[in-house]
Structures are given as C-alpha cells and as structure tokens.
C-alpha cells in the first residue's frame, strides 16, 4: 500500500525569526540545533533550522523575502505548525493515492538530490492551513542515516559551535519522539475531518471523548483520536462544544485567524519526573494544577490499576505533586502528563510532555483538572 506510513518524518513550523526560535527551543526544551539551510547554503527565500532530540525533528522555517508563503502565514497566524510530515516508501505514489482518495494537493512531488542520495516530498492539505507532506528518502538521506545524524536533505549544512548543543547533551531533557499531534477544528467539523483521515490516509479511530468526558461548568469539547495502521502516528481532532462561556478551542480559533490548526504537540519521555524537573529548571512555563487535584488522584488512579491487576504508580507521590504532574489510569496501565503554557504570545500552540506506563489513552481523568487550569489562564487573558 503506497500509504503505508513509517513514522513522523519531521514537524515544520513557520516562524517569524527562526534563529531566535531555534535558540528558544534549544534553551527551553533541550533540542540540538543540528543543521541549517539559509543564505550560506544558497537558500535565497527562506531559512530553515533542523532541531533534533531523540527521534523528534523540528524544522523551523522563516521567510527571507515577503513573497515566501511563510511570510503571509506568520502574519495571519503567528508562529505555529505548518506541516506534520510523514515518512513513506515512495512519496510520489503516496501523494497520488491520497489525491485519488479525495485529498487536495498542497504541492506536487519534487525531488532534491546530490551525488549521495535524494529526498522526494509531496504534500496534501488537511484542516485549516495544515499540510501533510509525504517524504521518501534515498541513499545518504534515508531515515536510518538521518537518525544517526545524517543530513536532512541536500542544501543543508551542519551547525558548528552552537554552545547550547554541548550543554543539552550533558543535561538532557529526555524527550524521545512525537506521541501525538492535536488539531482544533470549528464546531460541527470534527466528524468531517475524522472521515477525511479515514478516507484519504486510511487512519482508524483510536479513541473518542465527548462533552460528558471533557466538560467543566463553563466550557466543553469533543475529541476523536485518529491513528495510522501502525499506531505510530496519532492525530486527535478537537471541536468546541456548547458551554456557558467560550471554550479553549474557541479561544484558539479566534487567535488563529478563525482557522483550524495544530493546538499541541505531545512529546514522549521515559521519565516524566526527570524531564519535567529539567524543563522547569530551564524556565519552561507549565499550566498550574490546582492543589486539590492531588487530594483524590492517587485513590482514583491506584484503584483503577488495582482493579485491572496492575501495580500501583511507582513514581514518588510527593515528587509528582511538587512538579505539578497529572496522572491517569485505564485498563491497560497509567500515564503521566503535563502541558506547557502557549509557546508564543498568541494563545495557540503549546507542548505536552507525556510518559506512558502501559496506558495508551490520553488522560481522560485529567480533562477536568486540565480545563480548570486552562480556564484560569484564559480568564487572565480576558478571553472568557
């Protein structure tokens, strides 16, 4: 099947100033600033920085001229995610198949090559301004080589002497790979995009939550999680539900030029406590979880684990509370998670740091606490 998806190849951000964004993501989240394509490599209309950590690859792109497509998008949406790129065996065939399945082309297949190998990319549009690029890699640019520090594509060069890289190697944040990637769409549009992922990319529904699961007194949302066949690529889709006041999804849409987009990127760690402690030390701002959350969480979580024959949470309760981490369990095990505040001035994109101990769900038991924390922030911004 041409649409066999191997992995998340990279996540492309459009940003106003990639040099400064690269410094932020390196300093705050421990990414290595590895490669660059800019004026020095012959790229005349945009600059791109490749940041890596574990199997996570962020590509930060900024316009060098006002005619580059990223210039208009940064004006409309601020900094944010443009492209969740997917590694496939043959990008051209994957793109053809997706278009036959009803997908709309974002750009036609194009191949960049040199004597050592080639990279072919082709894109389709999903909700709002978001694109899925299909990426196939050959020779020196194949995925195993890339994971070992090989060049991203012809036209990139390695970054030498970026001082934070050594510091980040010695003080790792421990982020391993993209766990899932959440989109916000307009009211009434979630099922349309669920069907789109089924029809166009062959995804299947993995989980779903409705406003009974995710509601406070004020705001609610509905969410369905779409996953690729190998479950490596998960794309939850949120829509607002009717509440007394504006939901966080509605707030996102309003500050994202009334356009759907990527709300957050969840990054996986094997050690939530170590990762969060290191990120806090680096000055990352996380949502403040109400103290009352910890009064009932252990009973709820360990009770669920016991009922399904699992061991209790092994992380030290006090450390979990001190670091403000959320815990949830289901029949398969438990998870630990925490959400940053927005990563730019607009209340749009944020990150989630997640650790799974058996659980494959998304922290349903935390939705309420999370919403209360989000609403407190929303109120401070005057967006209720």
Indicate residue ranges for each PLM-predicted region.
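N-terminal beta-strand motif that seeds the catalytic metal site of vicinal oxygen chelate
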Residues: 1-19, 81-84, 145-194, 258-268, ...
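Core segments of cupin and vicinal oxygen chelate
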Residues: 3-6, 12-57, 100-101, 109-115, ...
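Vicinal oxygen chelate
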Residues: 6-16, 49-50, 69-96, 122-125, ...
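A structural feature that tracks compact, well-ordered secondary-structure segments
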Residues: 24, 61-63, 70-73, 85-89, ...
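ER-lumen resident redox/N-glycosylation machinery signature
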Residues: 36-37, 67-75, 135-136, 172, ...
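Hydrophobic, ordered structural segments
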Residues: 69, 77-163, 170-172, 182-184, ...
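Active-site-adjacent "gating/activation" loops or surface patches in catalytic cores
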Residues: 159, 230-251
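Long compositionally biased, domain-poor regions of proteins
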Residues: 233-235, 255-343, 349-357
């Amino acid at each position: 099947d041409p649409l066999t998806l191997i992995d998340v190849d990279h996540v492309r951000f459009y940003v106003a100033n990639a040099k400064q964004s690269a410094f932020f993501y390196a300093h705050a989240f421990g990414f290595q600033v590895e490669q660059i394509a800019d004026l020095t490599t012959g790229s005349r209309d945009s600059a791109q920085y490749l940041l890596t950590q574990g199997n996570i690859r962020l590509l930060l792109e900024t316009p060098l001229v006002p005619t580059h497509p990223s210039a208009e998008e940064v004006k409309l949406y601020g900094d944010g995610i443009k492209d969740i790129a997917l590694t496939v065996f043959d990008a051209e065939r994957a793109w053809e198949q997706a278009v036959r399945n009803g997908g709309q082309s974002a750009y036609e297949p194009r191949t960049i090559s040199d004597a050592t190998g080639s990279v072919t990319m082709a894109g389709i549009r999903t909700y709002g301004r978001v694109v899925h690029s299909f990426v196939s890699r050959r020779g020196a640019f194949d995925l195993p080589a890339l994971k070992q520090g090989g060049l991203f594509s012809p036209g990139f060069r390695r970054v030498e002497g970026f001082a934070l890289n050594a510091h980040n190697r010695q003080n790792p944040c421990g982020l391993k790979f993209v766990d899932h990637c959440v989109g916000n769409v307009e009211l009434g549009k979630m099922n349309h995009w669920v069907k789109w992922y089924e029809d166009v990319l062959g995804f299947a529904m993995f989980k779903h939550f409705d406003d009974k699961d995710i509601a406070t007194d004020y705001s609610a949302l509905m969410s369905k999680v779409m996953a690729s066949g190998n479950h490596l690529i998960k794309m939850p889709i949120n829509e607002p539900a009717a509440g007394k006041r504006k939901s966080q999804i509605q707030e996102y849409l309003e500050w994202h030029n009334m356009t759907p987009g990527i709300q957050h990127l969840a990054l996986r760690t094997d050690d939530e406590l170590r990762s969060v402690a290191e990120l806090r030390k680096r000055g990352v701002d996380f949502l403040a979880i109400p103290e009352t959350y910890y009064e009932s969480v252990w009973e709820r979580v360990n009770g669920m684990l016991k009922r399904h024959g699992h061991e209790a949470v092994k992380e030290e309760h006090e450390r979990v509370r001190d670091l403000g981490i959320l815990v949830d369990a289901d029949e398969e095990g438990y998870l630990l998670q925490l959400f940053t505040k927005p990563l730019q001035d607009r209340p749009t994109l944020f990150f989630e740091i997640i650790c799974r101990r058996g659980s494959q769900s998304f922290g349903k038991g935390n939705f309420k606490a999370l919403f209360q924390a989000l609403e407190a922030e929303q109120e401070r911004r005057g967006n209720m």
